[in-house]
Amino acid sequence: MAPPAPGPTSGGSGEVDELFDVKNAFYIGSYQQCINEAQRVKLSSPETDVERDVFLYRAYLAQRKFGVVLDEIKPSSAPELQAVRMFADYLAHESRRDSIVAELDREMSRSVDVTNTTFLLMAASIYLHDQNPDAALRALHQGDSLECTAMTVQILLKLDRLDLARKELKRMQDLDEDATLTQLATAWVSLATGGEKLQDAYYIFQEMADKCSPTLLLLNGQAACHMAQGRWEAAEGLLQEALDKDSGYPETLVNLIVLSQHLGKPPEVTNRYLSQLKDAHRSHPFIKEYQAKENDFDRLVLQYAPSA
């Protein structure tokens, strides 16, 4: 079984983290709960106010409410909030993305304030969306926070560098083994490892869902564990639950496309999920790869078509 969920004194210092519930909700993908907690919590210092607002606006970004972030974060706002606004600007304005990345490149080439963890995370997020994982990793390696390391683990797993991901996970475990982010990273690495580790990953996702909330992130994590073990029907139930919560969540739709193929569902079922994904997330990497393969297939068909 997974270790017990961490409490608000996690981090080794014994001090109470006033933002524990806000952060925890964000990390497990419970974005509305994060917003609610952020608006309700009473804080003891201006620095904590800024940190609270960072998570509040990042939760709005996760809900694709870019306008809220762009309207409310002003030029006079703290540098951490300016970084969140930069990412909101990137996500909201496709036509401006190249210029935003170019400006970010210039900032990264100068002396960066490595204590501004939010800037490093937002820079890495932009580079990742821009299909530049190397630049994302360079940004993250300048920070030493648990969240920077957790994001590094995610990127390394996407690059099939399980060996390096394990090393980063070890760093997280040495820093704070019981932290929510460390537990999630442990589940991601276990899922990528496969075999008997799949059950360990499943227990972590399940325990978090039971103790906190069965979020889209956790439901998809559980479903991925089932799919990796060939338990397609069990995965389908979890993915349907996720679909009921949000019919446009990209990971749910990608997993349902894969699952439909394995269960031999009619082609129209797979195509329906594919259309939903295209409508909601036309620049999603899965869609780009799918369209590239479609184009390759069309070229092959023309190549071997009988001449008139």
From Swiss-Prot:
GO cellular component: COPI vesicle coat; Golgi membrane
Pfam families per the UniProt record, alphabetical: Coatomer_E
PTM info: Phosphorylated by PKA.
Domain of life per record: Eukaryota
Subcellular location: Cytoplasm; Golgi apparatus membrane; Cytoplasmic vesicle, COPI-coated vesicle membrane
Phosphoserine sites (modified residues): S13, S45, S99
GO molecular function, one term: structural molecule activity
Membrane-topology descriptor: Peripheral membrane protein
The entry's keywords: Cytoplasm, Cytoplasmic vesicle, ER-Golgi transport, Golgi apparatus, Membrane, Phosphoprotein, Protein transport, Transport, Ubl conjugation
GO biological process terms on file: endoplasmic reticulum to Golgi vesicle-mediated transport; intra-Golgi vesicle-mediated transport; protein transport; retrograde vesicle-mediated transport, Golgi to endoplasmic reticulum
Function statement: The coatomer is a cytosolic protein complex that binds to dilysine motifs and reversibly associates with Golgi non-clathrin-coated vesicles, which further mediate biosynthetic protein transport from the ER, via the Golgi up to the trans Golgi network. The coatomer complex is required for budding from Golgi membranes, and is essential for the retrograde Golgi-to-ER transport of dilysine-tagged proteins.
Subunit relationships: Oligomeric complex that consists of at least the alpha, beta, beta', gamma, delta, epsilon and zeta subunits.
Family, similarity comment: Belongs to the COPE family.
Name by which UniProt lists this protein: Coatomer subunit epsilon
Gene source species: Pongo abelii
